[in-house]
């Protein structure tokens, strides 16, 4: 449509929030950011270290247009990914520049492991098994680094803190944050780092393979697996230009444009050792469930109506993830768990009425950024921009880590949140709306011992 369309879902966080007077200004603000992701030798060959580095690289590159991975050596990837056999090769395929020394031009540094302070603004990724987050200083040493899910979350939150500086128009202090991905609704205790041994689902049904669905796949692929494992992938859409900036599996370049999203996800999962079954059509509640079908559905759909249909479809467990769509709530994460197709009353708010959505769109059209945009794309193009939601890749990545963590809880026969709400700006202050009953029987899983 226009050069501004490709990254529009990200730049709308600035234009729609009144933080930039034009889409051109918003892109210029993002392009000024130069992130160094510095990976220390002590974390180079760990599951969490590799996941954090590549998540930070992928999400920073999508937000800011460039990123540098700084590392003294190299190491084979612990899991098999379709982007290379080593950390260095994978980072380059994700669009990063790789160097052995920090850049003097870096504006922000994300540090992973024992590394020297870099740019004037630094944030450290931190974790200890199921605990994950960020630190401003070196007081807390990284703990157990064998769980990749924690690395994914920490890398995403670190990039979120860089993005917060762009929104504020200045560098803001780094915020210490700690979340337990095992019990995300509780205030994290440094003495409770979660289990060393747990079960991982070996059968999953993933519905919706856009921003959130691809984040589920991303996190799954970083988990080591064994034995026969199956994922049913369902989506009817194709990769389009704006997906590169928001979706973790869409790589730099135009090679994937026009491909079905299920086929892109299929490549990643097969490489990681999963068997796949593809359904390239929408699920409107008409697909009968068989005894051999996956008992856990992970839903990453945008629209509420199909989610409500699926909530009553009868999956033994459905984990539904949703995120905010506007400039004021795009960092908000909601997760719901529905048991046996019986969602509790009031689990979802009433959907916005059509006239309310239309009023919100009209409210954007008169803003300076959209009036200036009209000169480039015309009236129809301006409306298309206004109707699109705000979406940033680090929110998807963080959501993927939370959802996969809770799917693992279910497979381990532990209860999961009926409703969980988290704001990524303050992830350690999540709220809980009750817990499901623990599963009464094995859902199909393989045991993992760190």
Segments from the language model and where they lie:
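Adenine nucleotide-associated cytosolic modules
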Residues: 1-450
């Amino acid at each position: 449509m226009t050069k501004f369309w490709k990254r529009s879902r990200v730049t709308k966080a600035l234009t729609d929030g009144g933080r930039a007077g034009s889409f051109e200004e918003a892109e210029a603000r993002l392009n000024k950011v130069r992130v160094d992701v510095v990976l220390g030798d002590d974390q180079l060959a760990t599951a969490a270290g590799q996941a954090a580095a590549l998540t930070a690289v992928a999400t920073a590159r999508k937000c800011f247009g460039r990123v540098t991975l700084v590392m003294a050596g190299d190491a084979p990837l612990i899991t098999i990914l379709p982007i290379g056999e080593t950390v260095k090769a994978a980072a380059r395929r994700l669009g990063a520049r790789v160097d052995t020394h920090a850049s003097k031009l870096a504006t922000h540094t994300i540090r992973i492991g024992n590394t020297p302070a870099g740019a004037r603004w630094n944030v450290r990724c931190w974790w200890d098994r199921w605990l994950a987050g960020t630190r401003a200083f070196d007081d807390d040493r990284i703990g157990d680094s064998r769980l990749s899910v924690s690395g994914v979350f920490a890398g995403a939150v670190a990039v979120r803190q860089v993005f917060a500086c762009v929104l504020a128009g200045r560098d803001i202090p780094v915020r210490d944050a700690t979340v337990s991905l095992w019990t995300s609704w509780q205030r994290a205790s440094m003495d409770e780092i979660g289990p060393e041994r747990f079960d991982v689902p070996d059968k999953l049904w993933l519905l919706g393979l856009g921003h959130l669905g691809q984040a589920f796949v991303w996190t799954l692929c970083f988990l080591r697996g064994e034995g026969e494992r199956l994922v049913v992938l369902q989506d009817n859409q194709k990769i389009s230009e704006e997906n590169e900036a928001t979706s973790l599996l869409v790589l730099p370049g135009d090679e994937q444009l026009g491909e079905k999203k299920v086929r892109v996800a299929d490549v990643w999962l097969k490489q990681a050792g999963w068997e796949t079954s593809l359904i390239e059509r929408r699920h409107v509640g008409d697909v009968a469930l068989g005894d051999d079908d996956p008992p856990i559905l992970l839903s990453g759909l945008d629209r509420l109506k199909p989610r409500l249909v699926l909530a009553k479809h009868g999956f033994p467990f459905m984990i539904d993830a949703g995120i905010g769509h506007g400039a004021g709530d795009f960092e908000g994460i909601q997760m719901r768990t529905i048991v046996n197709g019986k969602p509790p009353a009031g689990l979802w708010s009433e959907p916005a009425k059509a006239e309310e959505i239309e009023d919100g769109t009209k409210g954007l059209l008169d803003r300076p950024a959209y009036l200036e945009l009209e000169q480039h794309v015309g009236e129809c193009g301006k409306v298309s921009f206004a109707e699109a939601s705000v979406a940033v890749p680090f929110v998807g990545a963080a959501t993927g880590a939370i959802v996969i963590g809770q799917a693992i809880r279910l497979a381990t026969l532990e209860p999961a949140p009926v409703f969980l709400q988290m704001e990524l700006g303050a992830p350690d202050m999540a709220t809980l709306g009750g817990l499901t009953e623990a599963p009464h029987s094995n859902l199909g899983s393989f045991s993992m011992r760190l």
